[in-house]
A protein has these predicted regions:
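Accessory nucleic acid-recognition modules appended to NTPase machines
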Residues: 1-82
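Conserved nucleotide-binding/hydrolysis micro-motifs of P-loop NTPases
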Residues: 10, 101-104, 138-141
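Flexible, glycine-rich phosphate/dinucleotide-binding loops
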Residues: 12, 19, 94, 141, ...
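Extended hydrophobic-aromatic, low-complexity segments
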Residues: 22-24, 65-67, 82-83, 93-98, ...
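Conserved catalytic cores of phosphodiester-cleaving nucleases, focusing on short active-site segments
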Residues: 57, 83-106, 114-116, 132
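Conserved, well-folded catalytic cores of nucleic-acid-processing
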Residues: 60-64, 120, 151
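Basic, amphipathic alpha-helical patches used to engage nucleic acids or provide basic targeting signals
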Residues: 105-127, 147-150
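Domain-level recognition of nuclease-like catalytic cores that cleave nucleotide substrates
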Residues: 126-188
Length: 188
């Protein structure tokens, strides 16, 4: 039986802090960071970023693609590729996504690769159209940033959008006078 830590903050502690506690408590925290953490941080964050993107897709598919997601996961095990985010919306439309935690904006080559991979996979075969999600730590090159205005099936998600707040239903919106009400604005 094998267990994995599903909380990235705890996983970070167990990967970088715990094993180096003696050096850190001896005053070598900066050195631990420079020699160990800094060298492995991008790799560590790449996997964490994929999980963040999957969670975002589960929660916000309707806001992004117009329909709630029925299933969200990843495609692994192909000889020549994996797909970071994949799933199906309630209307049967499939979607595929690429998550990039890198220091450069996403370019057209990455978009083309995702299109090629989405066409190769057996998941969603026979579908009539699909949507593409591109998640980027550093945004998108100008030629990629204009793609959603030309092709409505392409969705670009940068860090600002990853932390977006959904629109509250009218019954969930706080009243202006909620603080003055006897029950503090609570609604059953």
């Amino acid at each position: 039986l094998r267990y994995a830590v599903n909380d990235h903050l705890i996983a970070f502690w167990h990967r970088f802090v715990g094993p180096n506690m003696s050096a850190i408590t001896a005053g070598g925290g900066s050195e631990v960071y420079d020699i160990i953490v800094d060298r492995a941080f991008s790799e560590y964050m790449g996997a964490a970023f994929e999980d963040i993107c999957l969670d975002f897709t589960r929660r916000h598919a309707k806001e992004v693609m117009g329909v709630t997601a029925q299933e969200v996961g990843q495609i692994w095990g192909h000889a020549d590729f994996d797909i970071d985010v994949a799933g199906r919306l309630l209307d049967g439309t499939h979607f595929y996504g690429e998550c990039k935690w890198r220091s450069a904006p996403i370019d057209r080559r990455i978009v083309a690769t995702l299109k090629e991979r989405s066409d190769k996979t057996a998941y969603g075969r026979g579908r009539s159209g699909h949507q593409l999600l591109l998640f980027s730590r550093r945004g998108f090159r100008p030629d990629v940033a204009e793609l959603p205005s030309v092709d409505a099936s392409i969705h670009l998600i940068d860090p600002d959008r990853l932390v977006f707040e959904p629109t509250l239903a009218p019954r969930d919106r706080p009243d202006d006078d909620a603080a003055d009400s006897p029950n503090g604005g609570f609604r059953p």
